[in-house]
Amino acid sequence: MICLGLVVDPKGRKASKSRGNVLDPNYLFDNFGSDAVRWYFFTSTQVGENYRTGTDTLRETVQQFFIPLWNCYSFFVTYARLDNFDPSQAQVPLNERHVLDRWLLSRLAWLVGAVGQGLEHYDAVEPARRIHRFVNDDLSNWYIRRSRRRFWKSQSDTDKAAAYQTLHQALMTVSQLLAPFAPYTADSIYRNLCGTSVHLSDWPDPPQTFDLAVETNMKLARDAVVGGLAARDSERMKVRQPLASAAIPGHPLPEEIAAIVREELNVKRLTFDAPQVQLDTTITDDLRLEGIARDIVRALQELRKKKGFEPQDRVRIRFAAPVFDQLLRAIERHTDYIQTEVLATTFEHVSQHLPLTEPDFDLIEVRGEKFPVWITRA
C-alpha cells in the first residue's frame, strides 16, 4: 500500500480560495512544464509526507535539474555537429579511454542498476534523486567540466572520439532512465540523439563498465579538491593563482588522476599522506606572472562573451601595451597559453597611440590596470 501526502502551500497550509493560495495546474504546466511538476513530486519529499508546492519550488526544480541536464545535452550537440560526430563509428575500447571516460561509465553502470532495482521495489523517490545527483554532480560538474578541452581541441583523434562516445552513451542512457519520470524531456533528448522515441526502447541493462578502483581513486581526488579549494578560500588565495605544491590525505593516486587534482587546485606538485590538505602559499615571481596571465585569459573570455562570440569561434586580438610592467611581462611570457585559451589565431601587441586612430576598442581590467583590446572574428 502506498499512501500519498497532501499538496499544501509553501508554508504547509491547505489550499483555500479564501487564502488565495490555490495553484492552477494548467498555469504550472504552461509556465514550468508538466515534466517539472512530475519531477518535483517524485523528488521533493518522501512518500506519505505533504508536498509544499509553489511557483518558487517549481522554479528551483527547473533551475536545479532540467537546465543543467539540457546544458549537458546542448554542449554535446553543439560540438558533435561541428565535428560531424557519427555514433555508429567503431567504438574506442574501454581500456584505451581517458580515466574520466572510464569513471563516468562506471558511475553510469551503477546508476542503471540502482534505478532499476529501486523501481522494481516500487520506490520512485530515491531512483529519481539518484538521477538528479548523477546529472548534476557526476555528468555536469565533473565529467563535462573536466573534459571540455577534449571537445574544444581542433584535431580529431582517438581521445576526442572516446569523449564523444562516452557522453553520447551517458545522455542516451540517462534519457532512458528518465523516461518514466519526465517523459517529454527524455523523449526530446533521446529522439534528437538517435531518431527514435525513447518510449520504444528497451529498459537499459547495466553496462559492463564497473571499475571500483577508478571510482575509489576519483572519490579521493574529488574529496581532496573540495578540501584544497576550502584551504585556498581560507587563505584568500584565488584559484587562478598557481601555487608550488599541495599535500593531500590518502594514498598516492595514479598519475592520470593526480593530474586532475593538480589542475583543479592549480598547483605544480602534489604529495600524499598528509593529515589534511596543506598548501604552499609562497608566491614566486614566475608563479605571480602565470597568475596574471590567467587573469588576462578570464578578462578576454568575458569580453568574448560580451561581444557575442560562440564558444567555438576563433578570434583575432590586438592589444595596446599596459603601463603595469608585470602585466606586459606576463603577456610576453605566456602568449601561447593566452592565445590557446581564448582561441585567438593572432595576438598582436600594438602601439599605445593606436586608440587615437582606431577608436573601436574595448577596455579590459586586470589587477587594477586597464588597457585597450581589439577583438574580431577570425
Model-predicted regions and their roles:
Residues 43:
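Structured mid-domain segments that build the active-site/substrate or prosthetic-cofactor binding neighborhood
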Residues 3-30, 34, 58-378:
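Feature 926 captures the class I aminoacyl-tRNA synthetase adenylation module centered on the KMSKS loop
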Residues 49-58:
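Short, solvent-exposed helix-loop connector elements
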Residues 39-40:
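Non-catalytic, structured segments within soluble enzyme domains
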